[in-house]
Structures are given as structure tokens and as C-alpha cells.
Amino acid sequence: MSYEERVNAHPNLGDESDVEEEALVNDYREQVNFDDGMSELDRTTSLGTGSQTQDLQAQLAAAATPLEYQATLETKFASYDNYCSLFHYILNSEGPVELEVPSYYWAWDVIDEFIYQFESFCRYRNRVARSGSNEEEAQLLRENPNTWGCYSVLNVLYSLIQKSQINEQLAAIKRGEDPLAFAGEYGSRPLYKMLGYFSIIGLLRVHCLLGDFSLALKTLDDIEMNKKAMFARVMAAHFTTYYYVGFSYMMMRRYGDAIRMFSHILVYVSRTKNFQKGGNSYDAIAKKNDQMYALIAICVALHPTRLDDTIHSALREKYGEQLLRLQHGGPDALPLFEELFRSACPKFISPTPPDFDNPALNIDPVDHHTAIFMDEVKNTLYNPTIRSYLKLYTTMDLKKLAGFLEVQPEVLRSWLLVNKQRSRQVRWVEGGLLEGEVVSANDLDYALENDLIHVSETKAGRRLVDWYLRNLARVY
């Protein structure tokens, strides 16, 4: 079958359509009942023989197996050495390693566990350095600063991407060309193609954990966020991708795009949850599911918008009273913003080893990013109150509004400027995830002419036809 025939074998569905959502759900049902669907990638058979192939398969199986929760420091060191040995063999052998890939799930499990162990080791090392209570472990960590080092992990991920030429293949798919023409000697092998592809998702995650949110989104330039993407075939990868993309958007103050990402995956999960129960990743997905609802609550409070009915109902059920407090704003909402952010944010890590000799100098990365986020919240704390007054007028004197709010006119002027600036957001339309158009993020706009505020409001009508069609489909 030619490349064009393979592409045309799948319907060309709109990214935002209900038909696509149904296709995603049906695809997930098939995955639950039949763990395959990658025959195009599995066409290469294993040429490896004897004990070498068996040993490599054993290493791959071990790499995809989670460490015990209470693993010792020596075990974590040994696990790092095993990963180094495995990836060195795959990347530096004379010619491609020939091995039959059991399934595309396997490659995700390897990359996912590799990054999880890196993340948990970094947090553990930082905790030991800050507490200063275990001198023996501190000494071991001090003597091995490069173990689970940030540079080593990034080097592995970038090397797998480069060796597989996966970005070139994905770019070719976007242009409608055959990716095999750009795959090269290594990228045509399922082993390298799968590891390279999921390494891109891994880079998104690592850069987000390090706090570089724009670079995190940049790594996905060649991946299309739709049902035809390979990550959508693995539920855990699908969920992880949308979580980190949505969170990166939120930290870049692109709340509309963050809500769109969170809503997409949460609707999908709500329609497939009966098929997930009993799966290995069900508990992790359920936890991330709750975290994303918390993040949507934060985004909606900072960027009021209409949500999908499914999301809105679930959000009111989970955070009804808390959501009202967030949307009301004011100093009383600050502790709630911080509580939800801490419970739902990634477990950030530091790119460098901590200072074991000066524990007081080490900062918890989660505290650092929470402080940055809370500074942004404080800047917009009075926006809901200001909006509630401005909605009542078409023109208003600055001093009069300052009197209502019991603040100085110049303080109010600064609030108005911040509010107006925050109402202009970049919104994705097409192209890379970092691209977009600057749009007005809410239905209320105003202009200052000396001390006179001119207010204009645009009310978007509810799309009742879509609402009726969606609910009729659910009933019948």
C-alpha cells in the first residue's frame, strides 16, 4: 500500500468535531480489546538471535518496570547505570539494533519510567540537601553529582530524536509526503521510531518540569494535536501530553488555550472511563484528571469563559463553592489559588545539583514556581470587582469608581491598565503551539480618556443549535 493510500484509508475529520471525539472513543475501545493497530510499524521482524537479543529484551523490560516506592539510594544509582548501558547500546552500536518491538505501548513505558525516575531522584536529592539530616546519603549524593544529571537525561532524549530522524518524518507527514523517505537507516526501524517519537513527549515534560514553558511547547512543533497523532493511541501518553501543554499555556498566561487543552482531554476521558477501569495506568490518570479540573478552575477564574457542558457540570460538582470564591477574587481568594496550584502543578525540579554544604541556600522548585504564579494572581486580584462595576456603566469617572472601591485614583488607574493588558492574550489558531493571534480575551473592553472611563461590552450569543444536537445525541 502506498503512503497516499495509507493516509486516505483514514477519514479526514475536523479537530474540534463531535465526529472526531466519537472516533477517538471507538479507537480507545478497540485498543482495550485488541492491543495492536501499529502493523505499519511492526512490519520489520527481528534479526537479532541468541542470548544477545534475549539480554536486550530483558533490559528493555526492566527499563519499563517501575522502581519500588521505597527503593534505596544504591538501587536508584544502579537503575541509572542500567539506563545508561541500554541507551548507549541502542545509540552507539555499529548499525541499527534489530529487535522486534512488542507494541508501541512499550516505548512509551520506557521513556515515561526513565523521566519519572529522573524527576523523583532530583526531588529526593533536593530534599536530602535541604533537610541535612542524613549525612551518609548526603555524602553519597555529593560524590555522584552527575548521576541522574539533567544534561545526561536531555542528551539521551535529544539523541534518540536525532538518531530516529523523527522530526523530519513528522514534517514530511504534514506536507503529505512519505515519511519513510526521510527516516534513514535508523528511523525506519520501529525500535528507533517509537523511542524517538515518545522522546519528543518526554522533552515536553522535562522542559516543563524545569520551568522552561516556551521551549516545552516548541518541542511539539512537528506533532499535530489531533486524533491521528501517535501519542493519542496510548492513553497515558495522550493524557500526559495535554496536561503539560495545557499547564505550559497557563504559566504563559494563555488561559484560553490552556482551557481548550484541558477541556479536550477531560471530555475524552469522561467518555472512555468505563474502558480504563482495571488498567495499569487508571489510578495515575484519575489523579491527573482531578489535577486538571483544579487547573481549569484556576484558568476560568483568571479568564472567565463558557465551558463545555460536561466540563462545567463536573467542575461545579468538584469545586462549586471554591470556584465561586476564586471568581469573586479579593485577598480571601489568595490561599485557595495557592492551594489548588500546589495540588495540581507538576513536581518541578532544579536543573543543577543542590548545595549540600549550605542547606539554607537550596530552594524548593515547587515553592519557587508557586511564588511566580502567585505574583501573577496578585496582579489580577481585583479584576472581578472592577469588571462588576464597569458592566453597569458605559462611561464612568475614575475618581467615582475609586470611591466605590475605596482606593486612591492612581492605584485604580494601575489596576485598570493591568486588567486591560491581561485581557489581550495570544490565542492559537494554526501552526506551532507557540504561534497565535492577539485577541481580546473577554467581552468587556474600556478606554481611558484622562479621568473618564469609556466602557463597551460584547455579549456572545449561546450556540443553541450545537447544544440541542449534542444533547439529542446523548439521549438517543
Curated annotation (Swiss-Prot):
Gene Ontology molecular function, alphabetical: translation initiation factor activity
Keywords: Cytoplasm, Initiation factor, Protein biosynthesis
Domain of life, per lineage: Eukaryota
Example of a GO cellular component annotation carried by this entry: eukaryotic 43S preinitiation complex
PROSITE patterns hit by this protein: PCI
Residue stretches making up the PCI domain: 257-452
GO BP annotations, alphabetical order: formation of cytoplasmic translation initiation complex; translational initiation
InterPro entries: eIF3l (IPR019382), PCI_dom (IPR000717)
Subcellular location(s) per record: Cytoplasm
Subunit and interaction comment: Component of the eukaryotic translation initiation factor 3 (eIF-3) complex.
UniProt similarity note: Belongs to the eIF-3 subunit L family.
PANTHER family hit by this protein: EUKARYOTIC TRANSLATION INITIATION FACTOR 3, EUKARYOTIC TRANSLATION INITIATION FACTOR 3 SUBUNIT L
HAMAP family the UniProt entry points to: eIF3l
Described function: Component of the eukaryotic translation initiation factor 3 (eIF-3) complex, which is involved in protein synthesis of a specialized repertoire of mRNAs and, together with other initiation factors, stimulates binding of mRNA and methionyl-tRNAi to the 40S ribosome. The eIF-3 complex specifically targets and initiates translation of a subset of mRNAs involved in cell proliferation.
Protein name, UniProt field: Eukaryotic translation initiation factor 3 subunit L
